Structure formats: structure tokens, C-alpha cells
A protein has these predicted regions:
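ABC family nucleotide-binding domain
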Residues: 2-202
Length: 202
């Protein structure tokens, strides 16, 4: 099986020598294609820091992270932007949807940035919307949607580009128990039926 994500002895420090906080201390693990891996731990244990390093929002202090065999800790500028755009999908706790765009436009945005033709964008958005049961909200703005609907729209946006890896940062944190259960079922569906590789922090 193909290794999608390889974490190789990474460390992350904050502060300076006299006042240093070690957020990640020599972590190594692999995630294979098609796996759904959940990282659990107490608040402040470094889970989100780890996800930020994998997503290139933050840089590791030492060690290496490989996605699809590519060492992402060495990427800069356009190469880094291209990697984020084409190989990663993000699902955030607070959704991060653009308030001025409809659900359809939020989901389509990632493909528009890649200059995908409009007909292909439309077909793909509608296919993903059907999978995640958000067809009825495609014309709505975020303020017109429930928390569960917003999270499913955010999930659709995350997978629309067929990324190698989807990163989910406490995706159920802002949801009630019913919506949280539904979202986890959707993520399971993405993983099992669409073979999406998922790394989730919870």
C-alpha cells in the first residue's frame, strides 16, 4: 500500500532558549493510502500544532514530513502554494466558509483557482453535493445554514480537488451531538466509499 503521509522524527519548539516550550517531541508515524487516522489527546498536547505542521501553516523545528513521497518541509513560494492547493484538503472546526459566497461558490472556489473549465466545475460540485447531501443548500449563504450543513459544505470543499490527504481539525467541535455523529458518518463514507485518506485531530 502507498504511504501518503510520513512523519519522520519531527519536533516543534516555541519561544527562545531561556523560555522554550516543546509542542512536539520526536514524533514519527505513517499514514497509508485510504486510511482514516484520528489523533486524540488532551487540550494543549500538540495535536493542532502537528496538524499545522502537516498542512504547512507552521514549520517544524526539526525532522521531516513527506506527503506522497515529497518532503514538504523544504517547499517554498509557488511550490508550497501549489502543494497546498492541489494535494491537501482542509476541514476546520469553525468551517472557514466565505460569508459573501453561496455554498456552491464556496465549494467551487478551489477548482476555479485551478482554472478548471466551468462545465467540469459544475458537474463536480453537483456530484460532491449529492454525496454529502447538500444539494438543497447550494444556493444558500453560510448565515442561512445550520452548523451541520456548513460543516458538510466545508467537507465538500475539502474533497472537491481529489486531494491526496484531507486534514480535519476537531471538525465536530462546533456541532451538537446529532450533527457531530452525522459528520463522522460522512467522513467515514468519504474514507470507505471514495477512498479519501483522512488525518483527524479530536
Amino acid at each position: 500500500m502507498e504511504t501518503i503521509l510520513k512523519i519522520d522524527n519531527i519536533e516543534k519548539y516555541y519561544g527562545n532558549k531561556s523560555n522554550m516550550t516543546k509542542a512536539i517531541d520526536g514524533i514519527s508515524f505513517d499514514v497509508e493510502a485510504g486510511e482514516f487516522v484520528a489523533i486524540m489527546g488532551a487540550s494543549g498536547s500538540g495535536k493542532t500544532t502537528l496538524l499545522n505542521c502537516v498542512s504547512t501553516i507552521d514549520k517544524v523545528s526539526s525532522g521531516h514530513i513527506y506527503v506522497g513521497g515529497k518532503d514538504i518541509t523544504t517547499l517554498k513560494g509557488n511550490k508550497l502554494n501549489e502543494f497546498r492547493r492541489e494535494e491537501l484538503g482542509f476541514i476546520f472546526q469553525d468551517f472557514n466558509l466565505l460569508d459573501t459566497l453561496t455554498a456552491y461558490e464556496n465549494v467551487a472556489l478551489a477548482l476555479s483557482i485551478q482554472n478548471v473549465p466551468a462545465k467540469q466545475i459544475d458537474a463536480k460540485v453537483r456530484a460532491v453535493a449529492k454525496e454529502l447531501e447538500i444539494e438543497s443548500v447550494l444556493k444558500k449563504y453560510p448565515y442561512q445554514m445550520s452548523g451541520g450543513q456548513k460543516q458538510r459544505v466545508a467537507s465538500a470543499r475539502a474533497i472537491i480537488t481529489d486531494p491526496k490527504l484531507v486534514l480535519a481539525d476537531e471538525p465536530t467541535g462546533a456541532l451538537d451531538s446529532k450533527s457531530a455523529k452525522l459528520l463522522l458518518e460522512r467522513l467515514k463514507h468519504l474514507n470507505e466509499d471514495l477512498m479519501t485518506t483522512i488525518l483527524m485531530v479530536t
